[in-house]
């Protein structure tokens, strides 16, 4: 626009019609690095070099490797073996890099740069031969080596595919710290297809590959062969540690998605990065698997239209620098870099209650209804719940409240106003009082006398999942998101007991009656009213285009609360 205006001014148009008569000039002060981050001044970053083909669309190859290595706070170097014109739709063209250039790149990188780990992906015959020479020259000083044998891609794009397979086995796999083949790669390395119908088949493949490739450690990736235990599908990756004659099976959640492009490259790069950071091989593999499964589950939308196999989200855990800069205590450039204005959307909510909108939202309602109509509350109300189940609930709730207090303190630290901070501290204090009540109940009702008993309570799966959720939201989320995550706990107990208030037949003075009375107290009802007002306030200060995030957070909180009570019902 500036160029167009200047052009118009030079063509004889009146200057005042298009150009401002007075030019403004403002000076913006750039902040120094955040104080804590300066502790890492001249940080010695672990270095990882990727030797692989490129993916011009960024989903796989060296592009995926660079993203992955960077996401693991390592320094990425590259040696491109093949240039490709490709997207998740198809490969449009490919051009191998000449052997001389590959050799020059490796020489330059290894001569002038530190290199902790080398990771390989799709290799050409030339690249394998050059790498073999360099590994021999380096001797005992060679970096660790992670080989992702991208054999299907190599055989599909190159007439020398079979040569690549034999050369990998002969020339570089004996130097490798680990090979990470998928099941198709395994068959090509073995020289035969095999039936894979049970875990034992995969174990045998891993052990045979170790022998054939002369590489001690083999990770057989299970993404292409999801297992079914009769209840649900899951992904099974098998790590064979040859020196220890040991298998480690990693069982992960199966995600029904087509966005898996580049997952294999990413896993090998994640393992290489973890090794560069000094983790053991088994730790590095675990970290790589979880990173990739998270990247798949979270996903990303970057293609113009639906594709058969889309890319994964390599940067799901990476922070946006500008967002942190805008909230920095010393940020003074608000005139030059204004914050996005937020228009409240309460007037668009039917009935003017964000809380009521949430509990009736299609994403939330099934979880909310299951929560506030739970059998646990009904059994407490009529006094028929087994005492051991209620004791289990009290013990789990005790540990939950400890984390709840921690989260409230984090919430307070992110509160926008002093009034909000004070409310968060009051809630934390109420939770602390409830902790005291739980201690009393365990002593007086359940005869707990051991002073160390509370420290010995083990966290059940439902509690671990719930606390993990709240703590993660408190660390990564903003004030509004944390408050919404805590809201189901604040509101649900009162609503659940209110539904059975006319059916409370538990003996008066019993622990069940006392619990119901507490949830039905005027204090708790007042807290619910305050909670509804707070939710409306949050809606007014949260970007309307991101409202679905709050819906999802609240729905998940209701689901976790339901699971918490279910765990008590199922305790034996």
Swiss-Prot record:
It is found in: Secreted. InterPro entries: Haem_Oase-like_multi-hlx (IPR016084), HMP/HMP-P_kinase_dom (IPR004399), PM/HMP-P_kinase-1 (IPR013749), Ribokinase-like (IPR029056), Thiaminase-2/PQQC (IPR004305), Thiaminase_II (IPR027574). It comes from the Eukaryota. The keyword Disulfide bond does not apply. Keywords: Secreted, Signal. One of its GO terms (biological process) is thiamine biosynthetic process. Induction: By absence of thiamine. Residues 1-19 form the signal peptide. Is not required for thiamine biosynthesis. This is Thiamine biosynthesis protein THI22. It comes from Saccharomyces cerevisiae (strain ATCC 204508 / S288c) (Baker's yeast). The lineage of its organism: Eukaryota, Fungi, Dikarya, Ascomycota, Saccharomycotina.
